[in-house]
A protein has these predicted regions:
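An N-terminus-focused feature that recognizes amino-terminal "leader" regions
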Residues: 1-58
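Long compositionally biased, domain-poor regions of proteins
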Residues: 5, 39-55, 75, 79, ...
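Short, surface-exposed beta-edge/turn micro-motifs
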Residues: 11-12, 68-70, 145-147
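Structural preference for beta-strand elements that scaffold enzyme active sites
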Residues: 13-15, 102, 147-149
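Hydrophobic, ordered structural segments
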Residues: 18-23, 60-142, 152
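Short coil/turn segments at secondary-structure boundaries
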Residues: 28-30, 86-87, 164
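Generic detector of short, locally flexible boundary/turn motifs and exposed helical patches
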Residues: 33-39, 65-70, 113-116, 162, ...
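Surface-exposed interaction/gating patches
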Residues: 127-173
């Protein structure tokens, strides 16, 4: 089997998709809804604040379609940090009005497809390339209301496997 390319890993990512229990929300007393909103805003502010400390970032996005209402996205330096962020939301009053419909855990990375020189300690790497690569392994989340997300898996069934192709062929794709 062909070897996968060398990689450099960055932050771990949790894509936490949630639906809102709209019936429970409408039935809740106004003070309970206000408290839920207040706790939700405080939760997000405290998790967005880690961006200033170079410990990751978080954001909430609206989801179109019928699979979820919200995407809470966390990027952190470890899986433990992701677990903590997820559990803290579940403890909020707002979390009581939501249910996780799906979640994906991944890690940001760059590979030798980007540049062999980046992985060669003897090579001098262009500063622009280094900046580009650092942006890939520690990305900044957009200040947008919507994002496009699709789960990526380069393994396609039992017989067609991306990693069966030689490195140069994969790099050309």
């Amino acid at each position: 089997m062909t070897e996968p390319p060398q990689t450099d890993e960055g932050w771990f990512v949790l894509h936490d998709f949630r639906t809102v229990d709209w019936d429970a929300w409408r039935d809740a007393a106004e003070r309970d809804r206000d408290r839920a909103i207040s706790e939700g805003v405080e939760y997000l502010r405290s998790h967005e604040a880690v961006e200033d400390a170079d410990e990751g970032t978080s954001a909430v996005f609206s989801v179109l379609g019928d699979k979820a209402d919200l995407l809470i996205l966390h990027l952190r330096p470890s899986l433990d940090h992701l677990s903590t962020a997820e559990r803290q939301f579940e403890k909020t009053e707002l979390g009581r009005y939501t249910a996780q419909t799906d979640s994906f855990v991944s890690v940001t990375e760059v590979s030798g497809y980007v540049s062999d020189a980046y992985f060669d300690e003897d090579e001098e790497v262009d500063e622009g390339l280094v900046s580009y690569i650092e942006g890939k392994i520690k990305p900044e989340l957009p200040a947008d209301e919507y994002v496009c997300f699709y789960p990526m898996n380069k393994r396609r069934g039992e017989t067609v496997n991306w990693y069966d192709l030689p490195f140069d062929d994969r790099a050309d794709l």
